[in-house]
């Protein structure tokens, strides 16, 4: 019975996160894992090469050693285990799941803010602080998007929730109220 990618990512990230907490190394593990993830994102064929039969085992091991050259022993062992169990293609998903666990443990929320004009850093910081207070987060990491169609105000999306404070929505609601009355 094969496991789906989400289950694999969840199990491996949970085990690694528990080790990171035990060793008080969550930030260090995350930093190392993010670097490795970026290598695999930038080189999508790398996981296939390490999983496939194109390269001899000794060349794969050399590649793994090069990849983890500056990593801690824990991360080296983790990557070696993924290789040994044929899970290199799951590395990006595992790191994503590890980062989600890290964020959850620190009450860090990622959100996208849409505005009609480009927000200044001060405006974005104010929105992040207000949103953090509203959702009970310690920190909000905002990505910004401009959409002139909202006319004014902002729309903040996070974790399948949308907080719409746009002028476009207010006009739509006003129009509906006028039509219904």
From Swiss-Prot:
**Alphabetized UniProt keyword annotations:** ATP synthesis, Cell membrane, CF(1), Hydrogen ion transport, Ion transport, Membrane, Transport
Question: What is one GO cellular-component annotation here?
Answer: plasma membrane
MF terms (GO), sorted A to Z: proton-transporting ATP synthase activity, rotational mechanism
Where does the source fall among the domains of life? Bacteria
Q: How does it sit in the membrane?
A: Peripheral membrane protein
Q: Does the keyword Amino-acid biosynthesis apply?
A: no
Q: What is its main location?
A: membrane
A Pfam family of this chain:
OSCP
Q: Which InterPro entries match?
A: ATP_synth_OSCP/delta_N_sf (IPR026015), ATPase_OSCP/d_CS (IPR020781), ATPase_OSCP/dsu (IPR000711)
| PROSITE patterns linked | ATPASE_DELTA (PS00389)
- The answer, when asked if Transmembrane helix is one of the entry's keywords, is no
Tell me where in or outside the cell this protein is found: Cell membrane
The function of this protein is: F(1)F(0) ATP synthase produces ATP from ADP in the presence of a proton or sodium gradient. F-type ATPases consist of two structural domains, F(1) containing the extramembraneous catalytic core and F(0) containing the membrane proton channel, linked together by a central stalk and a peripheral stalk. During catalysis, ATP synthesis in the catalytic domain of F(1) is coupled via a rotary mechanism of the central stalk subunits to proton translocation. This protein is part of the stalk that links CF(0) to CF(1). It either transmits conformational changes from CF(0) to CF(1) or is implicated in proton conduction.
PANTHER family under this entry? Answer: ATP SYNTHASE DELTA CHAIN
Summarize subunit and interaction data from the UniProt record for this chain: F-type ATPases have 2 components, F(1) - the catalytic core - and F(0) - the membrane proton channel. F(1) has five subunits: alpha(3), beta(3), gamma(1), delta(1), epsilon(1). F(0) has three main subunits: a(1), b(2) and c(10-14). The alpha and beta chains form an alternating ring which encloses part of the gamma chain. F(1) is attached to F(0) by a central stalk formed by the gamma and epsilon chains, while a peripheral stalk is formed by the delta and b chains.
Q: Which family does it belong to?
A: Belongs to the ATPase delta chain family.
Q: What is this protein called?
A: ATP synthase subunit delta
Its source organism is Lactiplantibacillus plantarum (strain ATCC BAA-793 / NCIMB 8826 / WCFS1)
- High-level lineage: Bacteria, Bacillati, Bacillota, Bacilli, Lactobacillales
């Amino acid at each position: 019975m094969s496991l789906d990618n989400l289950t694999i990512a969840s199990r491996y990230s949970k085990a690694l996160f528990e080790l990171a907490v035990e060793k008080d190394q969550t930030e260090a593990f995350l930093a190392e894992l993010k670097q490795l993830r970026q290598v695999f994102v930038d080189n999508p064929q790398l996981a296939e090469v390490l999983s496939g039969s194109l390269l001899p085992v000794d060349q794969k091991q050399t590649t793994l050693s090069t990849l983890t050259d500056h990593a801690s022993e824990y991360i080296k062992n983790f990557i070696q285990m993924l290789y040994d169990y044929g899970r290199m293609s799951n590395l990006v998903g595992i790191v994503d799941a590890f980062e989600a666990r890290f964020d959850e443990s620190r009450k860090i929320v990622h959100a996208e803010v849409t505005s009609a004009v480009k927000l200044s850093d001060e405006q974005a910081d104010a929105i992040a602080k207000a949103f953090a207070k509203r959702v009970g987060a310690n920190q909000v990491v905002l990505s910004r998007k401009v959409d002139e169609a909202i006319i004014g105000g902002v729309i903040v999306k996070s974790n399948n929730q949308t907080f719409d404070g746009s002028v476009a929505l207010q006009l739509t609601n006003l129009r509906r109220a006028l039509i219904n009355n």
